[in-house]
């Protein structure tokens, strides 16, 4: 006779076993109608799940945080059902939930077309409207293999064959379609009201390029139509802001097959890059960092000693010369320890803050490469601080101050912080971990920072703070990290002489703010839709002539701007001024300075912004002062 404890603390007593749906109906018919699933003693289950013993229960409705994953998984099955109905020869493979949606891979003799997607989506709506019941059953593994082979679903049979022999499997049926799945699922297809198929792409079976190519259909699903429409709007905005398209349109960079995942920077793109580096270099000097430079190619012996060769070898580019094996560095940490080790260190030398714009290479899979966001050659704003355990808190507090200040200058004020805490397998004593975790927490408290704990997600060598930005579309980008490391200094024999004369191992703090310059530039381009703040814009102002008579004056204006440190250009072409304004507006140049006969006569310029705002006429000195002040203000404008 089960006693069921509800979230409000009330306990319901029942005389006989009953389903989640029955409990919901006992509370109210409206709740039963809205119930999507249940969470029994923390485990998600279907509404048909039979409660036989005492338990705690949460009824999951579309308002619950668990609902979207269940809705999306169920919609993936709805997609597979629709494809099988329209294209019976297609074979189903896998259909997981992903961020903001789902996908399903199919083996089919041809590629699905946009017209196919429209037909499939229409069929999905038809099946959802039919409100087909979704039921669950279990089959022994060997029976399940034979069952799917009998249906002609060879891929599904192969998936099941990889599951341990003694394991029972669950299958879900809706109408005449049945698929392998752990569940849970919504009670019926009528719960699936807001979905959209977004694209189709190729995908290798089991992610192996040696296997056959499958057709992957992507989709999104939400609890209601309003949420779906909001998401599709964000998707449309993201498409407009795609840094790869803007990079081409604004002539910033390009990629080529001759160097996969490596950027060819054009003059304007490189100007932005240099501005980032110049800005970061100045900020690091303000915070007491010493800039260093370390080799690109390092003997494998260092990587073996640091542990990278054993754990990171597949992601490293390696080469051999003169019977020695080298690796192009994937990260700078071991090399920074070599600089620390060069010469005896005393406790008086700590903390020692070393920074490098580290040029790193990683052998990312070709399928994972994505514009500037995922590259093989990246420059990281690496820094490593060597300090004592007692200095961790003050150093981390200083890092957090720098992180907040830098992000603000780039226009990011909504920062999310996550504290990755000790995992089960780790180096160092509990006392040391206690001290380090407490130091990180106190440093964040001192900066009035709120954070989320992530138990067990720290690296084996120390806890970590992750700093993530929220962009204008609400997307979260993890950029900054502050990582405590108890392992690498000892591995690489770093030491210092303590106050009592004993030899001690320093703590090493890994710190990045932008992450990789390439990825951060991609984030900036998308956040601002190419309209970068004035201080970052590759061309900050352009002088536009109305006729050839103003050419000499336009050159004088440009030179004056350049002498004042403003990146300026001019357009002396014999084109209509409206054409010039439109062209440079599309190039996202912040200020357009128009000069005609009147402006020449009065030593002025007519000022217009890229957003079409007419600021009137100004003297050359006034526009120089205006732009200079805006550049100085950076992200505070």
UniProtKB/Swiss-Prot annotation:
It comes from Legionella pneumophila (strain Paris). Its cofactor is Zn(2+). It catalyses: tRNA(Thr) + L-threonine + ATP = L-threonyl-tRNA(Thr) + AMP + diphosphate + H(+). GO terms for molecular function: ATP binding; metal ion binding; threonine-tRNA ligase activity; tRNA binding. Coiled coil: none annotated. SUPFAM superfamilies: Class II aaRS ABD-related, Class II aaRS and biotin synthetases, TGS-like, ThrRS/AlaRS common domain. It is found in: Cytoplasm. Belongs to the class-II aminoacyl-tRNA synthetase family. Its EC number is 6.1.1.3. Binds 1 zinc ion per subunit. Catalyzes the attachment of threonine to tRNA(Thr) in a two-step reaction: L-threonine is first activated by ATP to form Thr-AMP and then transferred to the acceptor end of tRNA(Thr). Also edits incorrectly charged L-seryl-tRNA(Thr). Residues 1-61 form the TGS domain. GO terms for biological process: threonyl-tRNA aminoacylation. HAMAP family: Thr_tRNA_synth (MF_00184). This is Threonine--tRNA ligase. Its main location: cytoplasm. Keywords: Aminoacyl-tRNA synthetase, ATP-binding, Cytoplasm, Ligase, Metal-binding, Nucleotide-binding, Protein biosynthesis, RNA-binding, tRNA-binding, Zinc. Zn(2+) binds at residues 333, 384, 510. One of its GO terms (cellular component) is cytoplasm. Homodimer. PROSITE patterns: AA_TRNA_LIGASE_II, TGS. Residues 242-533 are annotated as: Catalytic. It holds the Pfam family tRNA_SAD. It is an enzyme of class 6 (ligase).
């Amino acid at each position: 006779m089960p006693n069921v404890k509800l979230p409000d603390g009330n306990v319901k007593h029942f005389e006989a076993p009953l389903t989640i749906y029955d409990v919901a109906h006992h509370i109210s018919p409206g709740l039963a109608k809205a119930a999507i699933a249940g969470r029994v003693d923390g485990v998600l289950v279907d509404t048909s799940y039979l409660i036989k013993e005492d338990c705690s229960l949460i009824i999951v409705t579309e308002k619950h945080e668990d609902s979207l994953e269940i809705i999306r998984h169920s919609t993936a099955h709805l997609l597979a059902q629709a494809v099988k109905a329209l294209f019976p020869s297609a074979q189903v493979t896998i259909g997981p939930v992903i961020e903001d949606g789902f996908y399903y891979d199919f083996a089919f003799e041809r590629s699905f077309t946009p017209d196919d997607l429209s037909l499939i989506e229409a069929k999905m709506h038809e099946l959802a409207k039919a409100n087909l019941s979704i039921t669950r059953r279990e089959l022994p593994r060997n029976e399940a293999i034979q069952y799917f082979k009998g249906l002609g679903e060879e891929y599904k049979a192969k998936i099941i064959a990889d599951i341990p022999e003694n394991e029972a499997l669950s299958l879900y049926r809706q109408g005449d379609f049945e698929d392998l799945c752990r569940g849970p699922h919504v009670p019926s297809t009528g719960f699936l009201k807001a979905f959209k198929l977004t694209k189709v792409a190729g995908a290798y079976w089991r992610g192996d390029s040696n296997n056959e190519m499958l057709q992957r259909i992507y989709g999104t699903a939400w609890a209601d139509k309003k949420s779906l429409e909001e998401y599709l709007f964000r998707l449309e905005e993201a498409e407009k802001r795609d840094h790869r398209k803007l990079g081409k349109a604004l002539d910033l960079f390009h990629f080529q097959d001759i160097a996969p995942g490596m950027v060819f920077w054009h003059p304007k793109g490189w100007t932005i890059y240099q501005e980032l580096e110049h800005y970061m270099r100045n900020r690091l000097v303000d915070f007491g960092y010493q800039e260093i430079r370390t080799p690109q190619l390092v003997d494998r012996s260092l990587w073996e000693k640091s542990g990278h060769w054993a754990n990171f070898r597949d992601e490293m580019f390696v080469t051999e010369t003169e019977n020695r094996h080298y690796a192009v560095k994937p990260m700078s940490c071991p090399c920074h320890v070599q600089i620390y080790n060069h010469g005896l260190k005393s406790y008086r030398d700590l903390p020692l803050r070393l920074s490098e714009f580290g040029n790193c290479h990683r052998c990312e899979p070709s399928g994972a490469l994505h514009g500037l966001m995922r590259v093989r050659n990246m420059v990281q704003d690496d820094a490593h601080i060597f300090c004592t355990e007692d200095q961790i808190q003050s150093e981390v507090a200083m890092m957090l101050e720098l992180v907040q200040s830098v992000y603000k200058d780039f226009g990011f004020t909504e920062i999310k912080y996550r504290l990755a805490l000790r995992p089960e397998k780790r180096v160092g004593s509990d006392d040391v971990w206690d001290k380090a975790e407490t130091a990180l927490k106190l440093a964040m408290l001192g900066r009035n920072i709120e954070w989320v704990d992530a138990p067990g997600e720290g690296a084996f060598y120390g806890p970590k703070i992750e700093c993530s930005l929220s962009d204008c579309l609400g997307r979260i980008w993890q950029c900054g990290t502050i990582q405590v490391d108890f392992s690498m200094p000892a591995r690489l024999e770093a030491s210092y002489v303590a106050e009592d004369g004993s030899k001690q191992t320093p703590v090493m703090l890994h710190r990045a703010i932008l992450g990789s310059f390439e990825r951060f530039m991609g984030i900036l381009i998308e956040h601002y839709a190419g309209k970068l703040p004035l201080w970052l814009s590759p061309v900050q102002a352009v002088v536009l002539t109305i006729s050839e008579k103003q050419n000499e004056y336009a050159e004088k204006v440009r030179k004056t701007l350049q002498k004042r440190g403003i990146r300026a250009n001019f357009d002396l072409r014999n084109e209509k001024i409206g054409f010039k304004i439109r062209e440079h507006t599309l190039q996202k140049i912040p200020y357009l300075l128009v000069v005609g006969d009147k402006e020449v006569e009065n030593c002025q310029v007519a000022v217009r912004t890229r957003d079409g705002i007419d600021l009137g006429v100004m003297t050359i000195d006034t526009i120089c002062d205006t732009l200079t002040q805006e550049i100085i203000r950076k992200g505070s404008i």
